[in-house]
Every structure is written in C-alpha cells, then in structure tokens.
From Swiss-Prot:
It holds the Pfam family Ribosomal_L9_N. Binds to the 23S rRNA. One of its GO terms (biological process) is translation. One of its GO terms (molecular function) is rRNA binding. Keywords: Ribonucleoprotein, Ribosomal protein, RNA-binding, rRNA-binding. It comes from Chlorobium phaeobacteroides (strain DSM 266 / SMG 266 / 2430). GO terms for cellular component: ribonucleoprotein complex; ribosome. Belongs to the bacterial ribosomal protein bL9 family. The gene is rplI. InterPro entries: Ribosomal_bL9 (IPR000244), Ribosomal_bL9/RNase_H1_N (IPR009027), Ribosomal_bL9_bac/chp (IPR020594), Ribosomal_bL9_C (IPR020069), Ribosomal_bL9_C_sf (IPR036791), Ribosomal_bL9_N (IPR020070), Ribosomal_bL9_N_sf (IPR036935). This is Large ribosomal subunit protein bL9. PROSITE patterns: RIBOSOMAL_L9.
Amino acid sequence: MKVILRKDVAALGDAGEVVAVKNGYANNYLIPQGMAIRATEGTLKALETERKQQVKKVEMLRKTARELAAKIEQMTLKVFAKAGESGKLFGTVTSGDIADALKAQGIEIDRRKITLEAPVKTLGKYEADAKVFSDVAVKISFEVEAEGSEA
C-alpha cells in the first residue's frame, strides 16, 4: 500500500514523502497513529498543491529577507552603554543590545541570530553577523557610544 507520511518516521522517510509499506503496517500502525494517510489520487493532488504553495511561501520569505539584509547593510547602528573615562565599558555590549537597537529602527531580528566575533568591552565601531533567513546572512555595523553623549 502506498501512503503519504504526515510525520518523520525513522525507518521510512520524512514528512510529505510517498512510500510503499505493507498493508498491515499501514492499517494497524501508521494510519491510526496519525503518521500517514492513504495515497489516493485526491491526496496526491493535494500534496502537490501544498508543496507548490510551500515553495512560493519560502521564495517570498527569502525575497523579503534579502531586502531586509540590503537595508541593514546600509545603516550604522548606535548602541549606548555606560563607560568610564578611558572608554572601557561597565559590562559588555551583547547581541540583545544590538537587537534592541535594530528594533528601535523598526527591524525585528531575534537576538539569538546575531553573533559577535568577540565580546565588545570598549567604545568604538564594530561589526556583527546576523542570519536573517536560512541562506541569507548580513553584516551589521554598529558604533558603541557612551551613555549621555546622545545629544
């Protein structure tokens, strides 16, 4: 019997794949557990339509991510932190601080997707990497300034 997997099954394949299994295995285990459905003409057409929609959705998200990356690359963020006379920070600038600075500019990126090469502990200009989409990465330029110099 041919079935369409609804969930990843270790011995058979990934969700969305059409696989041939024995009738008893399909009827007594896969289908009742919600792991698969029978592969009929209607379900195969529905699967194909769903795949096409998924591909379109991913392309739209990728296009939006590229536009966002281009916008981010052209800006230099200002991050304010408490600093001493010598320019040394009281603490460090983290990916969360950069995410907050981006949010102030109207751009939302999860702080976990922003990586710093080394801890930022002094005033100055730096770069961070951010993964905007699965295959779209961007360099974020930012400048660390002392709090109170915002004027």
